[in-house]
């Protein structure tokens, strides 16, 4: 049971990222499988170089970059959101192999972030809780409200002289940063990074969102993210 709970915590930020795109922004984003592995690959390389905390941060930034690429394809290249996500995900497969330098990399002898924070469960729980609180607070700010409004009625937001392109980019960057951070955490907790680890992550994320809504219902942004 404890192992299952820990695995759930490791995937928690993945679910939050999927929730942001599919429920708040109302946009299908299939970049998830690629950005999850991208975050894992970057985290693995830096962790192997004895920089575990930098690996988490860089992994999240890598995911944000992947989200921006998807946003660019949608807004500037006028590609359908589903196809844009597939294109980014496919391109990231080659990038991930290049970053890792092979199909997988072991981290058995490398220092991990949770070793400094008192073990896997406390460390992952702390990081997840802090990120969830920060994301929840962000969606109460002007920027967060713009994303929520764009998901409800993009035409109205555009008529209010708000840059909907920037809003979409920001939402996709945030969502994929969280997804990639989940991959970065998982890599260090399981002790290796694998180029095929992202396969099926979008299904896991969507299933988490749907199960959460069945249990808690749609009771607003705070309950939704939690």
Where are these regions (language model features)?
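Single transmembrane alpha-helix segments in multi-pass membrane proteins
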Residues: 1-51, 73-77, 210-219
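Hydrophobic alpha-helical transmembrane segments
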Residues: 4, 9, 34, 53-61, ...
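Hydrophobic core segments of alpha-helical transmembrane domains in multi-pass membrane transport
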Residues: 15, 40, 44, 93-94, ...
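Hydrophobic positions within alpha-helical transmembrane segments of bacterial inner-membrane proteins
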Residues: 16, 56, 60, 64, ...
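Alpha-helical transmembrane segments within multi-pass membrane transporters and channels
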Residues: 51-90
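Transmembrane helix-bundle core of multi-pass membrane transporters
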Residues: 81, 85-140, 169-170, 190-195
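Membrane-helix/interface signature in polytopic inner-membrane proteins
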Residues: 133-173
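Transmembrane alpha-helical segments in multi-pass inner-membrane proteins
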Residues: 179, 190-226
């Amino acid at each position: 049971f404890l192992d299952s709970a820990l695995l759930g915590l490791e995937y928690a930020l993945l679910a939050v990222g999927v929730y942001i795109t599919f429920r708040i922004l109302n946009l299908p984003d299939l970049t998830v499988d690629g950005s999850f592995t991208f975050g894992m690959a970057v985290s693995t390389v830096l962790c192997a170089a004895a920089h575990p905390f930098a690996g988490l941060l860089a992994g999240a930034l890598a995911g944000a970059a992947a989200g921006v690429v998807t946003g660019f394809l949608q807004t500037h290249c006028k590609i359908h959101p589903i196809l844009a996500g597939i294109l980014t995900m496919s391109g990231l497969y080659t990038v991930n192999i290049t970053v890792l330098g092979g199909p997988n990399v072991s981290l058995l002898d490398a220092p991990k972030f949770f070793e400094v924070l008192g073990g896997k469960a406390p460390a992952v729980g702390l990081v997840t809780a802090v990120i969830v609180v920060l994301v929840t607070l962000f969606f109460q700010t002007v920027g967060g409200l713009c994303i929520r409004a764009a998901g409800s009625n993009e035409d109205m937001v555009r008529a209010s002289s708000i840059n909907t392109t920037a809003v979409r980019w920001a939402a996709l960057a945030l969502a994929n940063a969280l997804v990639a951070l989940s991959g970065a955490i998982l890599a260090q907790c399981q002790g290796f990074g694998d180029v095929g680890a992202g396969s099926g992550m979008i299904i896991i994320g969507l299933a988490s969102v749907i199960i959460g809504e069945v249990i808690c219902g749609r009771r607003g942004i705070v309950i939704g993210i939690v």
